[in-house]
Structures are given as structure tokens and as C-alpha cells.
């Protein structure tokens, strides 16, 4: 049975092989033909797109070429326009140069003509000069024969007369110019000073080397003295002030030349009297406490003064020195009040003159700084103040204003000059200062002595409490021109040798009297 089925399976196998070969042939034929068609379609579309892209690029290139040609045309037109403008400008310059050349040639021609005329005139003048010299020689010879004098002798006589006339005229001219300048300066200065003083209001204070402390009863005097005087000795030792206990009812007198110590002593004694406990140990405690309080007051006085004057960023030591000025007096005038007054005056005058107001007020506030330490450092208070200001951080302008306010150094700024004026105004105003009688008499005598030292001075009188000096000269020794010179020289001597508030008027009198007797 199996043998009968083998041919059948073989037949089926052969049929399968045949169908497979037929299928492969059919697939290969139809599939290969489809792929070729697809590839042809792709190639065709690619060629079409390439053609369209080439046409588009050619069109874009033509458009860009047209635009570029248009831009080149515009640039060429612009360059051509610029060249035309430059050509026009050069042509105008050539025309101007040509006109200038013509003008120069014309001027040159005129100059040559003038030069020729001048040469002719020079020759003519030389001839006239020669004739004039000859005529002068002849006239001089005739004059010498007629006068009996040589030309040199005549010149000496003429020069002598002219010299005297010139001296007289120059003295008169100097007197007139100086008078006019003084009047004008007086007007301007009076206006500025009057404006400043009218805007200034200050209080007056007087110096005193003694002060009193009120006590409740006479028994307190004994307690202050203490057993065998130990309490009063402790007070004087701790404070450095003399305690005067006499018959003055209800008061103890404190005497001392250091105002700070005197103030400390007054505060300490006042507290001791109020407390009632008075013995050496308690005295030491109270004096130490009073010293601390006074130093706090000094600092407060300095800060208040700086604030009132608008002086910012002062060194702490400068503030303490300013505070000490509250306890110092000059001719009865409180130095700190005087410094504030000078600062205010300088600020007002600086405003009138258009100067630096802050600098002026700062100089005015610090100008008497040296008076706070004059008992500790040798030298004038102006120079001491100058050195202290530089040492404590002030600039050269401020230090110079301090140092030159008594003319001990040259001023560097106008504000420094203002300090001298404001200081004199503050010192010389009514009631500002009180001068001791001995100093007053000494100053008057010195004023008259200086005047009598000049040659030709007959008499000298100090008038108006030393505000004026009147001088009578000998008319035979001093002429009118010499009167002016004498007044000027005497003024300089007074400024150099005397110290005085305000100003001194110098009046020179020359009077010639001729007396004859009829017999």
C-alpha cells in the first residue's frame, strides 16, 4: 500500500516544484517591472523639480543682478554729485585765492609807493634836522654870550627849579589822590561795617579777678577756716585760689588770676556750704567733682560756640580750647563772646563782599584760640593759635587768618584781612573793652613821645582819649610837602610800635606867623 502511494507523493512534489518556479517567475517579472516604473517616476519628478528650481534660481539671479545694477547706478550718481560739489568748492576757493592774490598785489604796490614817499620824506627830514642842529648851535652860542652861562650851568639851574616844582606838585597830587582814595574807601567800608554792625547784637561782660560766695551766717566762716585753718588751707591747696575771709557780711571772697580754677573753687565752696560737711577729705571729693563738672561745661561751651558759628568738624581739642575762652577776658571783654562776635561780623562782611562765608566765620571763631593757652606756652596768642590750628587739622587758610590778625604774618586771603578789621571793630565798639588807667596813661605818653621824635616837630598832644594825635611843626623846618610825608611816616610808626583798639587820627598843623612892629 505504501508502495502504491509513493508515485502519488512524488507527483504532488513535482507539481509543487512547478508551481513554485512559476510563481517565482511571475513575481520576478511583474515586480521588476513595477520597480522600474517607480524609479522612472521618481527620476522624472526629480528632473522636473530640478528644472523648476533652476528656473527659479535663474529668475532670482536676474532680479538680484537688476537690483545690484540699480544700486551701482545710485552709488555712481552720488559719487558724481559729490565730485561735482567738491569741484564747485575747489573752484570757489580758487576764485577767493585769486581775489586775495589780486588784493595782496595791490597792497604790495601801494606799499612800494608809500615806501618811496617815506624815503623821500626821510631825506627831507634829515636835511631839516641838519639845518635845525646848525641853527640850534648858533642860537646856543648867541644865548651863552648873552647870558654869560654855559649850557651845562643853565641846565643845572633849570633842573633845580623843575625839581622843586615837581616835588611840590607831586606832594599835592599825592595828597589829593590819597584823600580821594581814603574818602571812597571810607564810604565803602562804612557801608559794609554799618550793615554788619546793624545786624549784630551782643551782650557785654566785664572781667573780674575776684568773685564772692554767699554764706548763710557768720558761723559758716569759722567752719570754712576749720581748726587751725586746716580747711581753708586744703581749699587753697586743691583749687589754687586765695580764699579771703574778712569782715564782709554774708560772703567769702575768692581771688585768683586763673578763671577756670576760680570757677571750680566757687562751685566747690557753694556745694560745701550747702552740704554743711566741711573737712579736708570732703573738700578733696567736692573739688574733684567740681573739676569734672567744669570740664564738662567747658566742652559744652565749645560745642555751643561751634554750632552758633557754623564751624563743623572741629577737632575735640579745639572745642575744649574754645570752651576755655568762656573763662578768659581781654580788657574786660569775654574772649569767647568776642570770638563769636568777630565770627558773626566776618560772615556778614564776607557776604557783602561776595567771599567765602564759612571760611570767614571759621577764622573769626578761632582767631583768639591762642589766648586759651598763653599762660602755658610762650609767644603771642596769634602765632600760638596759628600753630595750634595747623597741629589740630585746620587748613592753611584758617591758620593764616588766625596768625595774621595782629599783622604778625602776611595774609594769604581776603578773609584773613577781614579778621583784622572785624577784630578791631569788636574791640573798639562802645563798652566792649575796659582799659586799665595805667595802660591808658602809658599809651598816651608813648603816642606823644613817638611824635616828638620826628625832626621839625615842635609840640604833640594826645587828644580824644588817645584816639587823635595833634602835632604842631616848625614852619621853617617843615614845608607843605613835608607835612604830608610827616603824617604818613608817623602813622606807620604808630601802627608798628603801639597796640590800640580802633584807629588813631593823625593831624599835622603847620602855621607860619609873621609879626612886625610899626614904630
Curated annotation (Swiss-Prot):
It is an enzyme of class 3 (hydrolase). Keywords: Cell membrane, Endonuclease, Hydrolase, Membrane, Nuclease, RNA-binding, Transmembrane, Transmembrane helix. This is Ribonuclease Y. Belongs to the RNase Y family. One of its GO terms (biological process) is mRNA catabolic process. Its EC number is 3.1.-.-. It is found in: Cell membrane. It holds the Pfam family RNase_Y_N. Endoribonuclease that initiates mRNA decay. It comes from Protochlamydia amoebophila (strain UWE25). The chain crosses the membrane at residues 6-26. Its main location: membrane. PANTHER family: RIBONUCLEASE Y. Gene3D superfamilies: 3.30.300.20, Hypothetical protein af1432. One of its GO terms (cellular component) is plasma membrane. GO terms for molecular function: RNA binding; RNA endonuclease activity. Residues 335-428 form the HD domain. The gene is rny. It is a single-pass membrane protein. Residues 209-272 form the KH domain. InterPro entries: HD/PDEase_dom (IPR003607), HD_domain (IPR006674), HDIG_dom (IPR006675), KH_dom (IPR004087), KH_dom-like_a/b (IPR015946), KH_dom_type_1 (IPR004088), KH_dom_type_1_sf (IPR036612), Ribonuclease_Y (IPR017705). The keyword Nuclease applies.
Amino acid at each position: 500500500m505504501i508502495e502504491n502511494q509513493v508515485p502519488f507523493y512524488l507527483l504532488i512534489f513535482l507539481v509543487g516544484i512547478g508551481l513554485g518556479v512559476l510563481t517565482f517567475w511571475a513575481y520576478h517579472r511583474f515586480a521588476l517591472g513595477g520597480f522600474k516604473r517607480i524609479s522612472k517616476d521618481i527620476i522624472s519628478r526629480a528632473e522636473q523639480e530640478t528644472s523648476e528650481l533652476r528656473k527659479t534660481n535663474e529668475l532670482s539671479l536676474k532680479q538680484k543682478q537688476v537690483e545690484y545694477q540699480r544700486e551701482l547706478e545710485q552709488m555712481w550718481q552720488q559719487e558724481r554729485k559729490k565730485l561735482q560739489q567738491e569741484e564747485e568748492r575747489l573752484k570757489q576757493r580758487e576764485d577767493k585765492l585769486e581775489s586775495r592774490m589780486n588784493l595782496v598785489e595791490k597792497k604790495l604796490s601801494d606799499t612800494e609807493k608809500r615806501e618811496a614817499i617815506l624815503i623821500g620824506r626821510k631825506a627831507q627830514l634829515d636835511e631839516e634836522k641838519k639845518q635845525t642842529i646848525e641853527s640850534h648851535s648858533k642860537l646856543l652860542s648867541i644865548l651863552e654870550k648873552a647870558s654869560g652861562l654855559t649850557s651845562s650851568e643853565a641846565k643845572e639851574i633849570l633842573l633845580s627849579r623843575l625839581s622843586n616844582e615837581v616835588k611840590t606838585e607831586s606832594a599835592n597830587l599825592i595828597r589829593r589822590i590819597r584823600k580821594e582814595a581814603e574818602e571812597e574807601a571810607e564810604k565803602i567800608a562804612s557801608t559794609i561795617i554799618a550793615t554788619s554792625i546793624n545786624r549784630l547784637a551782643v551782650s557785654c561782660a566785664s572781667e573780674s579777678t575776684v568773685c564772692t560766695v554767699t554764706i548763710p551766717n557768720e558761723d559758716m566762716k569759722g567752719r570754712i577756716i576749720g581748726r587751725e585753718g586746716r580747711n581753708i588751707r586744703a581749699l587753697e591747696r586743691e583749687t589754687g585760689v586765695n580764699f579771703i575771709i574778712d569782715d564782709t557780711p554774708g560772703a567769702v571772697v575768692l581771688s585768683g588770676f586763673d578763671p577756670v580754677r576760680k570757677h571750680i573753687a566757687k562751685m566747690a565752696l557753694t556745694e560745701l556750704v550747702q552740704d554743711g560737711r566741711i573737712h579736708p577729705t570732703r573738700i578733696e571729693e567736692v573739688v574733684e567733682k567740681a573739676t569734672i563738672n567744669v570740664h564738662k561745661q567747658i566742652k559744652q561751651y565749645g560745642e555751643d560756640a561751634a554750632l552758633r558759628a557754623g564751624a563743623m568738624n572741629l577737632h575735640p581739642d579745639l572745642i575744649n580750647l574754645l570752651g576755655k575762652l568762656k573763662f578768659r577776658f581781654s580788657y574786660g571783654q569775654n574772649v569767647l563772646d568776642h570770638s563769636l562776635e568777630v565770627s558773626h561780623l566776618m560772615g556778614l562782611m564776607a557776604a557783602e563782599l561776595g567771599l567765602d562765608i564759612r571760611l570767614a566765620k571759621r577764622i573769626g571763631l578761632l582767631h583768639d584760640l591762642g589766648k586759651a593757652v598763653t599762660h602755658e606756652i610762650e609767644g603771642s596768642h596769634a602765632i600760638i593759635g596759628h600753630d595750634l590750628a595747623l597741629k589740630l587739622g585746620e587748613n592753611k587758610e584758617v591758620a593764616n587768618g588766625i596768625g595774621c590778625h595782629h599783622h604778625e604774618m602776611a595774609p594769604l586771603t581776603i578773609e584773613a584781612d577781614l579778621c583784622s578789621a572785624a577784630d578791631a571793630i569788636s574791640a573798639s565798639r562802645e563798652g566792649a573793652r575796659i582799659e586799665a588807667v595805667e595802660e591808658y596813661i602809658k599809651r598816651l605818653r608813648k603816642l606823644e613821645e613817638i611824635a616828638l621824635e620826628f625832626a621839625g616837630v615842635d609840640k604833640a598832644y594826645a587828644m580824644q582819649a588817645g584816639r587823635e594825635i595833634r602835632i604842631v611843626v616848625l614852619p621853617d623846618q617843615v614845608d607843605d610837602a613835608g607835612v604830608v610825608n610827616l603824617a604818613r611816616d608817623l602813622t606807620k610808626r604808630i601802627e608798628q610800635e603801639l597796640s590800640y583798639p580802633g584807629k588813631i587820627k593823625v593831624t599835622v598843623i603847620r602855621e607860619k606867623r609873621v609879626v612886625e612892629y610899626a614904630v
